[in-house]
Amino acid sequence: MNKKELFDAFDGFSQNLMVTLAEIEAMKKQVQGLVEENTILRLENTKLRERLSQLEHENLAKTSSKQGKDHLEGIYDEGFHICNFFYGQRRENDEECMFCRELLDRK
């Protein structure tokens, strides 16, 4: 191998290294963009999970309250008091009780 061939080989190798370096830099930028996007998505996911948990908790509280109120209304409709003053006693002639009605009409 003479000097010219050796120089040409080094020049070709140098050109290949420059192309490879450019490809690596492009990959590096792409990975950096993906890492940033991943971080943003993780934060958004965390916030959405917190919001979903909050909504589920609120929904559970509303459901529990509604079930309890429905149960009391059923007892009242069967002719029994649900108020603190006469709880469990039968209402005479299914008369309305203002204390029981106040409990049922609360929101």
Curated annotation (Swiss-Prot):
UniProt key word Cytoplasm: yes
Domain of life: Bacteria
Alphabetized Pfam families for the sequence: YabA (PF06156)
Chief location bin: cytoplasm
Location(s) in or outside the cell: Cytoplasm, Nucleoid
InterPro entries: YabA
Residue positions binding Zn(2+): H81, C83, C97, C100
Family under the similarity heading: Belongs to the YabA family.
Subunit relationships: Homotetramer. Interacts with both DnaA and DnaN, acting as a bridge between these two proteins.
HAMAP family referenced in this protein's UniProt entry, alphabetically: YabA
Protein name per its UniProtKB record: Replication initiation control protein YabA
Species classification: Bacteria, Bacillati, Bacillota, Bacilli, Lactobacillales
